[in-house]
Amino acid sequence: MLRVARLSRLALLSLTAVIFSGCANINLISAVGSSSVQPLLSKLSSHYVLNHNDKDNLVEISVQAGGSSAGVKAITKGLADIGNVSKNTKSYAEENKQLWMDKKLKTITLGKDAIAVIYKAPSEFKGKLVLTKDNLNDLYDLFAGSKSVDINKFVENGQTTKNSNHNLIGFPRTGGAFASGTAEAFLKFSGLTQTKTLDKDSKEILEGQRNYGPNARPTSETNIEAFNTFVTTLRQPNLYGMVYLSLGFVNNNMNLIKSEGFEVLKVKYDNNAVTPSSQAVSSNTYKWVRPLNSVVSLLPKQKTLPSIQRFFNWLLFSNNSEIKKIYDDFGVLELTADEKKKMFKTGNAEMSNIANFWVDDYSLNNQTFGAL
């Protein structure tokens, strides 16, 4: 049966582009990498294609997930036009310094996301669990899976609940921090100062050097797959646990999270227990934050480079209210002017100075890798 009426505007544009390919220059841009960057960039690129496309230089943008390591591999090996990475790219750049320089790679920070932990607990524990600098290592031991960690470790003020001992299950990302930007942010960017050194075994497991222990249930990389594994496993009676997710995902699915009986873990900074939220990130009271980055090659022979530059110029410097709405919908914070300046070689973060923005990472004065 003919179903043209059901085609989305984007599908119609793609079909039109194919039919009239002789009448317009169509640039196909591919983006691969972080599952946290993917939904945001997909929405932004779809909006751009539908509303701001240059009729004389049509562009189509395909955004696929796969993890931050896949994004770095794709951009360094020329398998994609954009590599998406939800972590600081400095370690990748230093590991592949000559290749990074030869390809003139530039890290573009799209915005800021945060990590949030959600948990399932017995009714007597609901609202009572708090992460602090004193039990941070217990959280890491839980997700490493090599030790049994009781829920009472996270009860505020150390007040245990009589006859209520429940070992938790951690749901980490497969491959650990080596493969996942979300996992790296979970391990390294809590904003809490550990009071004790993390157990060597737990550290190596979470870094991805060793396999998870028997008490962990590793999940796929994407937020939705991690959440679904968490939900499905913990529907069994008397099982309790924790999973870390993108704050944007948590914000957008809060009703579902609450309907399943889950809670969001508070984090205590300077004696103030903070619930993760976009407002708390913006005010710097919640510090478990990571960058959402795209990496592109600035080599002149890159055929899609002009189209890529037009897209990111629109995204970062047009001050378009539609962009802000998309960011708000995903719970992602836009960069401040000062943060954008870090991606420029000189001067201010304005379109009038855009030539100084399109400078590769190793040619910047401070050799910065994105804005954060």
UniProtKB/Swiss-Prot annotation:
The keyword Lipoprotein applies. It is found in: Cell membrane. This is Uncharacterized lipoprotein MG412 homolog. Keywords: Cell membrane, Lipoprotein, Membrane, Palmitate, Signal. It is a lipid-anchor. GO terms for cellular component: plasma membrane. PROSITE patterns: PROKAR_LIPOPROTEIN. It comes from Mycoplasma pneumoniae (strain ATCC 29342 / M129 / Subtype 1) (Mycoplasmoides pneumoniae). Residues 1-22 form the signal peptide. The keyword Protein biosynthesis does not apply. PANTHER family: PERIPLASMIC PHOSPHATE BINDING COMPONENT OF PHOSPHATE ABC TRANSPORTER (PTHR30570), PHOSPHATE-BINDING PROTEIN PSTS (PTHR30570:SF1). It comes from the Bacteria. Disulfide bonds: none annotated. A lipid is attached at residue 23 (S-diacylglycerol cysteine). A lipid is attached at residue 23 (N-palmitoyl cysteine).
